[in-house]
Amino acid sequence: MEIEKSNNGGSNPSAGEEFKDMIKGVTKFLMMVIFLGTIMLWIMMPTLTYRTKWLPHLRIKFGTSTYFGATGTTLFMYMFPMMVVACLGCVYLHFKNRKSPHHIDRETKGGVWSKLRKPMLVKGPLGIVSVTEITFLAMFVALLLWCFITYLRNSFATITPKSAAAHDESLWQAKLESAALRLGLIGNICLAFLFLPVARGSSLLPAMGLTSESSIKYHIWLGHMVMALFTVHGLCYIIYWASMHEISQMIMWDTKGVSNLAGEIALAAGLVMWATTYPKIRRRFFEVFFYTHYLYIVFMLFFVLHVGISFSFIALPGFYIFLVDRFLRFLQSRENVRLLAARILPSDTMELTFSKNSKLVYSPTSIMFVNIPSISKLQWHPFTITSSSKLEPEKLSIVIKKEGKWSTKLHQRLSSSDQIDRLAVSVEGPYGPASADFLRHEALVMVCGGSGITPFISVIRDLIATSQKETCKIPKITLICAFKKSSEISMLDLVLPLSGLETELSSDINIKIEAFITRDNDAGDEAKAGKIKTLWFKPSLSDQSISSILGPNSWLWLGAILASSFLIFMIIIGIITRYYIYPIDHNTNKIYSLTSKTIIYILVISVSIMATCSAAMLWNKKKYGKVESKQVQNVDRPSPTSSPTSSWGYNSLREIESTPQESLVQRTNLHFGERPNLKKLLLDVEGSSVGVLVCGPKKMRQKVAEICSSGLAENLHFESISFSW
């Protein structure tokens, strides 16, 4: 009877699911309306209609208050709407995450949306870009061009030889100064979006179906635009001042208007960051790239001091959301987490297993940032989570490949003969998609190279857990993996967890693995004899299980933080302005120091964010701390020097009982000395909807994207997972 009920629920959504869909639809509609309204303001901003009709009316309505003064205009026009959108996004994601596992969102079923997500450009400076991404990029560039051309046309129309002579300028100098100003205005539009892709816990990205990792390329594009526009903006002003014999303007700090020196400091910080993003520098000297990016604090601080707080609110909403996310990550990273065990594979791969709060739920392909102070106190590195919160509710695992200096030091420490009782670790995350609707496909093909297999381990484990606990149909799984050496086959041992499975894989799981070893012609002695070393740690009682900093209802709490911190900010600023600034300045903006006013706003924003985030964290820690204390496991375990060898490469030499691992081995085909024929393997997969995921080298991702976009098979739906930034 229970099975019949579940099956009916899979095809006919319950009233509860329909209500959630309705709430999601309403919130997403409101988000879209408000966001499009903000875009409309940007479109109208350079026009004469906005300047002569809209702006005077808006200033009378919002800019004459004794509580906010002239700042109220941009505060309520740009800052307030985006905060509402972010809060609505939190509500949307809360209900989205509450859907049943067999319920498929209407927007993910396919059709036109699936075609728009197909790759359009495979090779080139932009990387692999879909039709949707190209469309939005073109629309954004069109917005920038529209604003710049309209600004110039309207400003140049007022510049005449007579007006230029009145300011002791030639015509070209007046036009150069006008163009320089407009370039800065266009840069502010790009800056408004710059920090949203790197706000890992933001509600805006997952509400649009994006993750922070997949959105890094948008941050890169926007970063290049911002720095290009601001650099030309600064150079034009330097040329203008030099031609006017006013080069001393470069060191001017006007406390009642624009501070040139502050702008130059901001630009210098931005140029240092921009220089380290050069691919060769970023890849060879990642630490330099990583550390110099902390100059964003200097960049934003002096940008606000340069233009003043009132104009900054046009570009500050994204940075405000980023600050909330950044401080929450800071609070989470202050605690050490409980590291239970480490496995070292023959392929120089390490699996770290942590204790996890059972209420922490994350989606497959999520990542987590890890810091190990004994190796480096400052470096944080992202790693893919390989475990499934459904299959292993109290454990979380990540896989680390020995490649750079940091991972090499970790491998040396874990491999040393000296016994390690404890390893202090701090984490940030997990971060990932709000949901992963793999069930919408009839078949799932995962193509990976080397350590690119790690995100797919979590996908497979999640589908296995779903097959054990739910009655929905599981897609056929094909894992195509390419390794350089036979010793790397041992990474397939990580596909299944050490515990949490039944005696055999469920018959509902139709999984096939095609493993290609490109440089070896057989398994080799190293792969046959390689031992898997396992270490068990004895964590300190002060170590915490990994948990969400805001508890199980994290999206609602994030919305509450955004709303309350912004409300507190407005209340405090309203009081300060009404009873301190207004009696001095009377809304003239000519008496009270603009620099002092800006610093007050920055301090109030910082205090509001820190206070609300800390209060929310302490509340959730107090509420769910008791649950976590009951999860403390007996960590006084032996530390064996090695465990059984890998299941691959020698299975024909031994007889073992039926286990999930052996069941997986039987479904694996090993191909030595050859590369996968991706075109044949992908086109041979049957099904009306085939999800194709790829994670690996750039050429592999491009090849798979080219096949999926070629039109040879309309049923292939491409998705790339890249961590090469």
Swiss-Prot record:
Q: Where is the signal peptide?
A: none
Q: Which Pfam families match?
A: FAD_binding_8 (PF08022), Ferric_reduct (PF01794), NAD_binding_6 (PF08030)
| Gene Ontology MF, one | ferric-chelate reductase activity
GO BP annotations, alphabetical order: response to bacterium; siderophore-dependent iron import into cell
Chain segments annotated as transmembrane: 29-48, 75-93, 126-149, 218-241, 292-316, 339-359, 555-577, 598-619
Domain FAD-binding FR-type, first and last residues per copy:
332-437
> Which EC number(s) does UniProt give?
1.16.1.7
UniProt: NAD(+) binding residues: G429, P430, Y431, G432
Q: Where does FAD bind?
A: H381, P382, F383, T384
Give the protein's biological function: Flavocytochrome that transfers electrons across the plasma membrane to reduce ferric iron chelates to form soluble ferrous iron in the rhizosphere. May be involved in the delivery of iron to developing pollen grains. Also acts as a copper-chelate reductase. Involved in glycine betaine-mediated chilling tolerance and reactive oxygen species accumulation.
The name under which this protein is listed is: Ferric reduction oxidase 2
Species annotation:
Arabidopsis thaliana (Mouse-ear cress)
